[in-house]
């Protein structure tokens, strides 16, 4: 699950200052991997790696950078369609004021933050927490995350009835990830022959499995192998993972 979230809530060392910052994000994803999606999204939004990777650390309410706001909705939570350019602008304004200092610590500067509320997805928001709440409460959020997670675990998108049923499970739980994962893998279709054979292993999964089979404990060799296969951890090719 940590690998899934690393590819979904993407940051990359090619733009982030230090490996330490990337490792801290890894630990954050590990902490929240089967926890609450809302809490994880709140934490990632003000995480040093994400602030640097998608330019939140360069954003002020007077001159908001829209990169993170746009990807937050399009790639991380809602998908294309449920929001407008005005929503992107509003989210960027409300998210402004978070920075990373020279010691890689994150801090909030109220002088750079929004002076008052803005309208996002039909709600009044003025802080990062408000932005995440508005997004997570949107009816497109649960089905979007369900589809992405179902695809990762099974190799296929759910049909509409299955998606809506899983989205209801996810929403009723308050966006808890573990019950959603359990609902996906406990369904009889998960182990049916066509379904179970449709998902190819990612290079990282294949290499880890191979090392386990042969009893090899060599991180350097593992890194060389996944790099040769085109899937280096902490270096995704773009924000889509």
Question: Where on the chain are the PLM-derived regions?
Answer:
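Generic structural signal for individual residues within well-ordered alpha-helical segments
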Residues: 41, 89, 164, 178-181
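Acidic/polar loop patches that form or flank catalytic/metal-binding clefts of enzymes
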Residues: 84, 102-103, 177-179, 192-193
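Alpha-helix capping and helix-coil boundary motifs
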Residues: 36, 126-127, 175-176, 189, ...
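Flexible, low-complexity segments enriched for small/polar residues
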Residues: 142, 146-173, 181-241
């Amino acid at each position: 699950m940590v690998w899934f979230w690393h590819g979904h809530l993407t940051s990359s060392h090619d733009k982030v200052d230090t490996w330490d910052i990337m490792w801290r994000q890894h630990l954050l994803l590990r902490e929240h991997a089967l926890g609450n999606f809302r809490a994880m999204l709140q934490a990632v939004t003000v995480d040093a790696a994400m602030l640097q990777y998608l330019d939140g650390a360069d954003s002020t309410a007077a001159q908001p950078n829209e990169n993170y706001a746009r990807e937050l909705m399009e790639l991380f939570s809602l998908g294309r369609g449920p929001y407008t350019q005005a929503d992107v602008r509003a989210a960027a304004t409300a998210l402004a004021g978070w920075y990373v200092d020279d010691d890689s610590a994150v801090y909030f500067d109220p002088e750079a933050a929004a002076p008052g509320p803005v309208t996002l997805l039909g709600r009044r928001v003025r802080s990062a927490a408000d932005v995440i709440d508005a997004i997570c409460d949107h009816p497109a959020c649960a089905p979007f995350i369900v589809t992405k997670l179902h695809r990762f675990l099974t190799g296929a998108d759910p049909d509409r009835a299955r998606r809506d049923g899983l989205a209801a499970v996810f929403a009723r739980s308050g966006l808890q990830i573990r019950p959603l994962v359990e609902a996906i893998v406990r369904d009889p279709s998960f182990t049916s022959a066509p379904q179970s054979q449709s998902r190819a292993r990612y290079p990282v999964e294949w290499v880890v499995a191979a090392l386990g089979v042969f009893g090899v404990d060599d991180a350097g060799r593992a890194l060389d192998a996944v790099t040769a296969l085109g899937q280096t951890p902490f270096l995704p090719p773009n924000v889509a993972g």
